[in-house]
Amino acid sequence: MKETIDFLIDTIEARQVLDSRGNPTVEAEVFLECGASGRAIVPSGASTGAHEAHELRDGGSKYMGKGVLNAVNKIHETISPALCGLSALDQTTVDKLMIEIDGTFNKSNLGANSILAVSLATARASANALDVPLYRYLGDPLSNLLPVPLMNVINGGAHAPNSLDFQEFMLVPHGVQNFSESLRMGTEIFHSLKSLLDKKGLSTAVGDEGGFAPNLSSSEEAGDLLLEAIQKAGFIPGEQVSLALDAASTEFYSDGIYKYEGKSLNSSEMISYLSRLVSNYPIVSIEDGLAEDDWEGWSELNKELGNKVQLVGDDLFVTNTERLRKGIMEKSANSILIKVNQIGTLTETLEAIELAKTSGFTSVISHRSGETEDTTIADLSVATRSGQIKTGSLSRSERIAKYNRLLKIEEELGNQARFAGALGLGPKNI
């Protein structure tokens, strides 16, 4: 084992780079005394929950106000001097010190984007110094579970310029023995779907997450297209490939009413509609079926559908343990979406995953619509044995990078690798 001094943080560099939407984001690089280093780039969301940690942006005219030079300066002028000399192996101390220096409930002083970039880069530097893969460093020798992918192949809502209110229509290829076969199934269905859209004269342009963005009239039309594409590719809906939805309901909710497909629905009516979809399609997971602060509605939704499908809180929980505890107490869902930039540190992310696990909730590790080439979430999904990952469609390199990383992890693990779909450890009831 190397001397402890080798793992001390020597310097931290940061810079402004671009994400997949052409918007600025923060990259941090942590250098250790031993010469090892780690780099991380943070993502950014389009449909952001009101309770997410604060992203620091510059304002002004450059990059339409979305520059992050202020966040970069916070790293150079405040975070780096405070962390230099600390052990990179002590992730909790590193993260808690940044939280303490920030001093706000939502990280609005230093910015969650600057804090997270340093947090993730610190973990990667430690893994590199120890010469182990990130998933092994964050996990343990039993971290060998490859996740079921939830593949967003039809985009709507805030992710696409079309008339669909629901944000994501996903494939869940689970009925195989390993991740690589699951990825192959999803890819073949993706190309099958493109062919169908072409034949129907519908757009094959893709949205922010790489899925198609055809101008469909309803969620049912999207569901029918997916079933047709699954069968056209030679697979069995429900048995080999199921469906998942991200309604992102907060985006069309106001004053207790859901403005959905030209109708005004209250919570009970929205729940009834979701229940009909579950009855008519092989849906195994619904994310943000109701709005982020419709707590009473969420409890009713869980009573109605919680024993049938996975009910995932994204905007509801925002990877925050306090909101998750409330959801557990009120029985508001049975799953949490994990987005590292919603909470802003690796330590808090791992705490949320652990709380979910000990409370009988599933966890879905997730990307953001504004992504980068960073593949941390692929390693995180294996490290935590979450069993599920959302990282977009089967196009756009920032999405494919995560899938390719998972292929490499599966190859590294060899016969030790296990696939969550084959073990029934993905979404509920697959």
UniProtKB/Swiss-Prot annotation:
Q: Which SUPFAM superfamilies match?
A: Enolase C-terminal domain-like, Enolase N-terminal domain-like
> One Gene Ontology cellular component annotation?
extracellular region
Write the Enzyme Commission number(s) for this entry.
4.2.1.11
Q: Where is the active site?
A: 209, 339
- Record-level GO BP terms: glycolytic process
Its function, per the record, reads: Catalyzes the reversible conversion of 2-phosphoglycerate (2-PG) into phosphoenolpyruvate (PEP). It is essential for the degradation of carbohydrates via glycolysis.
Protein's UniProt name: Enolase
Q: Species name for this entry?
A: Prochlorococcus marinus (strain MIT 9312)
